[in-house]
């Protein structure tokens, strides 16, 4: 894969030379090039911004340098067409599935805006994707680009030594990954769950699935609405609700039918569904 990044702060992207992404580049699994947008300016001050039409605070990045930069970069490999990405808080959310989609591409160009953003005409003319990494505002697109490039690169074949690491990632199956443990077996009085030391691979897989369901229900309940849950999964979700309510006035969940009834009813005892688990499976 080829990745080009256009920015007014090329040094901001130097972390891409380190760790996993840096090793991938050194092994020619990905070719990452950064470009200084100011190289495509033609005035003594190397100006890339101007005041916004319609008034308002801040400055807007001018279209001419961006268009010149993108034309020049694309012309260097006319046999391929890149997918152009603009990081912006006004974009669609970046997700693991989005990372997987981008990882299927042959060539990506990231356009790192600054100030109030890039002139909308450039975005309309060039951008294939406008992507947000979260509901907050950064000073520019560089940090978001670092996030996306790492998320995409680690999905490329051969980048991660153990491919199962990717399969077991948070979000790989639509759920958050559960807790992980290593040696020593007991630390500061806290023991590793016995099941993980049992050698029973089927039981360990079930435990991990259940922990992933519990963590997702507590922290990102909306994710549960996007996946198909088995009856056993729904039992775990329902028991998580019961625990969040301290049991309420309901009898214990003793089987799948009880769990499904509770999950579909949406309340336990006379209390509302817990704020920590607000998906349709949990509330």
Curated annotation (Swiss-Prot):
S-adenosyl-L-methionine binds at residues 113, 133-138. It is found in: Cytoplasm. The keyword Transferase applies. Coiled coil: none annotated. Keywords: Cytoplasm, Methyltransferase, S-adenosyl-L-methionine, Transferase, tRNA processing. Gene3D superfamilies: 3.40.1280.10, tRNA(m1g37)methyltransferase, domain 2 (1.10.1270.20). Its main location: cytoplasm. One of its GO terms (cellular component) is cytosol. GO terms for molecular function: tRNA (guanine(37)-N1)-methyltransferase activity. It comes from the Bacteria. InterPro entries: Alpha/beta_knot_MTases, tRNA_m1G_MeTrfase_C_sf, tRNA_m1G_MeTrfase_TrmD, tRNA_m1G_MTases_N, tRNA_MeTrfase_TRMD/TRM10. Its EC number is 2.1.1.228. Pfam families: tRNA_m1G_MT (PF01746). The keyword Transferase applies. CDD domains: TrmD-like. It catalyses: guanosine(37) in tRNA + S-adenosyl-L-methionine = N(1)-methylguanosine(37) in tRNA + S-adenosyl-L-homocysteine + H(+). Signal peptide: none annotated. One of its GO terms (biological process) is tRNA N1-guanine methylation. Homodimer. HAMAP family: TrmD. Specifically methylates guanosine-37 in various tRNAs. Belongs to the RNA methyltransferase TrmD family. This is tRNA (guanine-N(1)-)-methyltransferase.
